[in-house]
Amino acid sequence: MVTSAVRRANRGADRLKWIMALFMVLAATPLSAKSGPTTIDSPSHLVSVTVTTDEEGHATYSIKRGDAPVVAPSKLGFLLTDAPQIFRNLEIVRVLNSQHDESWEQPWGEWRSIRNKYRELKVFLREKSPLRRELTVVFRVFDDGVGFRYEFPEQPNLKQVNIAEELTQFAIAEPATAWWAPAFESNREEYLYNRTPIAEIGIAQTPLTLKTTSGLYISLHEAALVDYSGMNIAKVTGGLLKAVLTPSAIGPKVSRAAPFPTPWRVLMIATSAPALYMANPLILNLNEPNKLGDVSWVHPRKFVGIWWGMHLDRQSWASGPKHGATNAYARQMIDFAAANGFTGLLVEGWNKGWDGDWFANGEDFSFTQAYDDFDLKAVTDYGRKKGVALIGHHETSANAAHYESQMDAAFALDHSLGIDSVKTGYVSDAGGFKVLAADGRIVYDWHEGQASARHHLKVVETAARYHIAIDAHEPIKDTGLRRTYPNWVSREGQRGMEYNAWGSPKNPPEHEANLIFTRMLGGPMDFTPGILSLKGRGDTDILSTAAKQLALYVVIYSPIQMVADLPENYAKYPELVRFIRDVPTDWADTRVLNGEIGNYATIVRKDRHSEDWFLGSVTDERARTLVVSLDFLTPGKHYIAEIYRDGADADFRTEKRHSTVVEHRAVGSTDTMALALAPGGGQAIRFKLKK
């Protein structure tokens, strides 16, 4: 029954929405044609963008933070395959200003609520040449960065847009240090980060992180990569960088019919590394709102897996005497998960196609037929009784065309069995992404090209029809599309824990402190932490302390977190497993207390479903003591800090890497704590509210 009070409240809400809509219309102020510069400031006047045209008719933009230049005048435009370039002879025919302010709630994430506040400048460009082609550039200016994109309107002289290259420049205004991973190399995104002067960048993937000599931190990335080629960054000279689109084997780098927008080109700008991380909701804000509606079927969770044993070469994906995905072992893993409150089991190697050279022969995979020693229905039924959901696995060997031919049948089967999450895989060398050409041929393409962008979105949209979430490995980069498609829960996209099994080299101690301020600015990463054995293949040492493995559950964000080690290894460390059981994967709030790229970081997160906070702190190969304030705790409330810290003798280089102290301490919001981190170490803390 709806009461009169509820009706009045609803009418009030509707009236408020109408007033806000009217305000937005009135705020959109069209201006007449102008040849001089046009400037727009962020809401608090921290960041400004100026757009103009030079004497040759190049459209340029520049960015300042306060009075300090961040990006010097940089050119905009396109090189086309079958028409003259859109680069020179441009004039600004009209500009349009508007502003926007809203808060929206994530169904899952690092923050429950996100503020989306910006000022927008639309710049309408037209050629002076006889073709009179038009191009719009839209700038959204936030207090912590800028996003801009191109929009190709419908027009008679540019109906089909075939892009040979995007000519966007980023002229960084002062010398800077760059953290970057190379593009177009064989292992796709899975490279350790280079740290070089900006002038020594080769061709880099995004996100790319910069620290200028004056202390500004900048991340270059993109948002809303839809039906377009992924952007890479190349050095031109000095601090001048340019966009380089990923190539295509089936035509131009991008081919689309107008009208359409490009992805957003994004610069996050901050005065510290922690502030740079806190700016990453900007990527989400540049994406469209949720298109799926009710997504209560998407479940953040911790899960175990038939996975690490394969990477250790104790088990195999292929059938035979070492086959890992058997009914008996799956039941054993389900029992382990249920006993510890973990609600998922990933099973790799369950389906036919792994025998032989699966790396090269992705067309051999079936996504509906199991090996004889694995009964998919029986295992899912057993897990359901124990409260443990099976997580499907679809390794494609990057044969996207073959996968698409089975995708509906595979997701329909999963849905019928109650499987609500699937991990996809695209293992291949760079340039080995197999797609269908217009003439029906299978051709080799790039993991970040336009065909890949189309494929990944098709997977996510198809999965959504069957209420299935997607965790993509060897994926296309994260550009915030999880806002639009909340079933795209996580992905790999950098060196994860598996490199500590067989990598040469293994992940060094600074790797995670690099990831936090580089890769993680794009979005969640399925890093697969929690290897308490600290051993890789052949009994080799992992370059970490045990306490750091716990801290990774907090500092490397993903709404799905793997409890990646073998059950027999967890049995040796019951005190440490308690933290893994307790730590959530879904958060109401996140704060970065300290950090420097590649050196250290401390992050605290508030559980979405309780008043508890969780802290993770990690360091590189150097021991550190970091003093942190507990002012994030609720004032006047009392908490018990459950502390998991490196022992005084802990060191990733010695047999004392397991040395861990577990202790408890009463704390409140006015307290500080000194976090003593061993070389290659970390610390994890649960702040539990006293009832």
Question: What are these language model-derived features?
Answer:
Residues 1-15:
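N-terminal secretory signal peptides that target proteins for export/translocation
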Residues 34-292:
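N-terminal accessory beta-strand-rich subdomains and adjacent acidic, glycine-rich linkers
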Residues 257-340, 344:
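An acidic-aromatic substrate-binding cleft motif
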